[in-house]
Amino acid sequence: EISHEEKKPVILCKYASSMLHLNSSKYFLTEFSGDWAHEANVTERELAFGKKVIDTKLGARANMFVSPFFQLALDNSSQENAGEVLVGTIGWTGNFRFTFEVDNKNELRIISGINPYDSEYSLPAKEVFRTPDFYFTYSTQGKGEASRSFHDWARNHQVKNGNDTRMTLLNNWESTYFDFDENKLIGLMDEATKLGVDMFLLDDGWFANKYPRSSDHQGLGDWEETAGKLPNGVGRLVEEAQKKGIKFGIWIEPEMVNPKSELYEKHKDWVIHLPNRDEYYFRNQMVLDLSNPK
């Protein structure tokens, strides 16, 4: 925690959550990288003198190309059931940075926290700024034990009802993509019931009328049922799910908008953008400024 008693706000520029100091003969770092549908590719390398940084500056998409956790084996490369292994992560969904520095004595320091890039924070007097928690576990029985320890901790202390039985669900996306109507969805619910599934989840494609959501190029932001697909609304689907004894879920992405939408036409100023810069689209969409009181 950081606080002060100056008369004016203090600008915080660099504030890590933790620093671990290790002394071992060798250090083997495992990191995970990838992309959509190609996630968590494993790379292990021995650390030598100097710095190795794992970080991201993508903000809300912080875990898209690099995962916010690491694995460190001591003395030897990592094994499943033997050897010393430390696994760490940070309780933070934005820009992060892990710095691994081996010095001239072959000692290792691991500094973890919010990425200082574009992260200046104005802290008023007598208020407290709390850095995100750094979570780690240590194993003498390899990465398998470390992984299980993290799973146990998450179930017992982090995840709501973490030890309850997990629900099974049927999501219509891979079955229909954007091409569905009320009857097709009810038919999928019937099949879900036969399988003993606990929940039916209605995915992307159920909304917008002026620009119906028939692809990812339009409709995002217009949160009303598409009359051509769901003439009786989402309520009819909920009723059908209740009759069949299954739960009903629905997909929504309220923070995003397509340029081809009624919302964008009426409130273009609600979109986050940089002055004098062209709009940038990812999956044909942009981010809404949820801090805008309008």
Language-model-detected regions and their locations in the chain:
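Aromatic-lined carbohydrate-binding/catalytic grooves of carbohydrate-active enzymes
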Residues: 161-294
